């Protein structure tokens, strides 16, 4: 399937010139080697893909959310499949001072804050295919107030111990203070971004399929995000709590006649979880796995939580480790909750491919519009590569992005060589020669041309 054919449905949001430019750029990206920058692309583009053309394309305002949605709905959506929305933030390292939105963001790869750009992404995961398709990407740009909160400047010298001196006075809740409504939250730019992007995505996908859950990593495992997901998006959250979270079992004893009904029972001891909550136990290679599920309470959350605790024990050393997952959907079975949270990691493969193959880490643009277009183009190529790979993986499951790029690159070399032949060469013969070209530099050396229809 030709790339221009895949992009033909974008006429709803792009003009004909932009579609042609995008097709030339996309074909160069899937063919080229080296860094995916504007200059690098211009060295691999065919006729109509000069550096100035690429530069003009990068300075256009393009609705990437609509572009990604049209590609997904036309080529990747499968009626009848179950879908899950997942979200995560990715950080790309950048140097200098001029790039739009540059700041210090925490990178899980480096394990510390690094200088760079951050982008929040929402994708749709097919539960049947177990693949993630990014549909919305937005840059995280901190205001001056946010930056001051994240990294405040010290205003006074602290003691040698590094802790401020405590002032004398009564400890505890001030007299006369009222209980706060946990369903009323303090909105932050991060919560506004999640609400805005979530509503935009649901408006597009709801007519096609029913979405019930939004899976997020442990950074979003708090009451504020849960209330946004429940109240604004009308979805159920699936996320992770800290492994030392103070969880309480629901009180099951007799209620006293005076005062508010007692809600909190015994505090959960992760080393001695009651066996009546155990729903699964297995042993493999001296590792015992126990899974517990119960409806529990957390004092910072407004509503009860469906909590799943996975405990792994090394039978020789008796060392233990546990993970605490939760959902606001109290009817969700433990197998489904665990599986949906595992599917959240599919978005990490989108980030990996975008950085490794499609220029998410390589772009050198500094202004807002070119930066947005470079990132949108990278995630568009992630979705286009899914479509192109599906053509070969039906027969050759191990066919990878590297094999795809090797195949396109080999055909490009063949095209340049065939231009040296006389003009009377049969076009049908040229097409057959291109199909028979071996993928030079491919990871898998099987003859790819035997897979072509």
Name the predicted role of every residue range.
Residues 5-21, 29-97, 103-104, 201, ...:
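Electropositive nucleic-acid engagement tracts
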Residues 41, 81-95, 122, 213-221, ...:
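Short, conserved catalytic/metal-binding motifs centered on acidic residues
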Residues 52-56, 109-211, 303-325:
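Electropositive, glycine- and tryptophan-enriched low-complexity nucleic-acid-binding patches
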Residues 58-159, 291, 295-297:
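Active-site-proximal, Lys/Arg-enriched surface segment
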Residues 91, 267, 334-365:
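Short amphipathic alpha-helical "interface-anchor" segments enriched in bulky aromatics
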Residues 162-310, 397-403, 445-446, 451:
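An internal, acidic/charged active-site-proximal segment
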Residues 362-417:
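Basic, amphipathic alpha-helical segments enriched in Lys/Arg and hydrophobic/aromatic residues
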Residues 405-453:
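Long, low-complexity C-terminal extensions of enzymes
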């Amino acid at each position: 399937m030709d790339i221009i054919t895949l992009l033909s449905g974008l006429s709803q949001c792009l003009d004909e010139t932009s579609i042609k430019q995008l097709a030339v750029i996309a074909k160069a990206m899937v063919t080229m080697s080296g860094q995916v920058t504007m200059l690098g692309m211009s060295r691999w583009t065919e006729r109509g893909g000069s550096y100035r053309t690429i530069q003009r394309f990068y300075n256009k305002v393009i609705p990437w959310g609509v572009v990604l949605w049209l590609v997904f709905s036309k080529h990747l959506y499968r009626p009848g499949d179950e879908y899950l929305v997942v979200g995560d933030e990715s950080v790309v390292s950048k140097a200098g001072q001029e790039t739009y939105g540059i700041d210090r963001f925490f990178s899980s790869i480096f394990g510390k804050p690094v200088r760079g750009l951050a982008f929040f992404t929402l994708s749709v995961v097919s539960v049947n295919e177990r693949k993630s398709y990014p549909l919305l990407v937005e840059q995280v740009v901190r205001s001056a107030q946010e930056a001051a909160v994240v990294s405040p400047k010290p205003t006074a010298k602290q003691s040698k111990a590094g802790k401020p001196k405590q002032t004398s006075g009564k400890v505890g809740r001030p007299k006369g203070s009222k209980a706060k409504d946990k369903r009323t939250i303090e909105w932050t730019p991060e919560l506004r971004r999640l609400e805005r992007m979530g509503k935009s995505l649901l408006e597009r996908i709801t007519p096609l399929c029913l979405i019930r859950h939004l899976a997020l990593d442990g950074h979003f495992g708090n009451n504020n995000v849960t209330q946004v997901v429940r109240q604004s998006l009308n979805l159920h959250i699936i996320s992770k709590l800290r492994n030392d979270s103070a969880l309480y079992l629901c009180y099951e004893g007799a209620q006293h006649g005076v005062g508010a009904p007692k809600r909190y029972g015994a505090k959960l001891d992760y080393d001695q979880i009651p066996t009546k909550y155990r729903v699964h136990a297995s042993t493999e290679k001296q590792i015992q796995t126990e899974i517990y599920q119960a409806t529990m309470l957390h004092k910072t959350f407004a509503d009860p939580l469906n909590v799943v605790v996975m405990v792994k024990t090394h039978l020789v050393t008796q060392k233990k480790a546990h993970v605490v997952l939760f959902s606001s959907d109290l009817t969700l079975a433990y197998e489904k909750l665990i599986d949906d949270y595992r599917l959240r990691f599919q978005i990490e493969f989108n980030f990996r491919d975008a950085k490794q193959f499609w220029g998410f880490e390589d772009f050198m643009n500094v202004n807002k519009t070119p930066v947005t277009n470079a990132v949108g183009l990278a995630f568009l190529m992630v979705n286009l590569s899914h479509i192109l790979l599906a053509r070969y993986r039906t027969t050759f499951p191990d066919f990878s992005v590297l094999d795809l790029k090797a195949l396109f690159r080999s055909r490009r070399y063949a095209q340049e060589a065939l231009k040296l032949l006389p003009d009377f060469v049969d076009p049908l013969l040229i097409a057959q020669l291109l199909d028979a070209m071996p993928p030079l530099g491919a990871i898998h050396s099987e003859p790819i041309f035997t897979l072509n229809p």
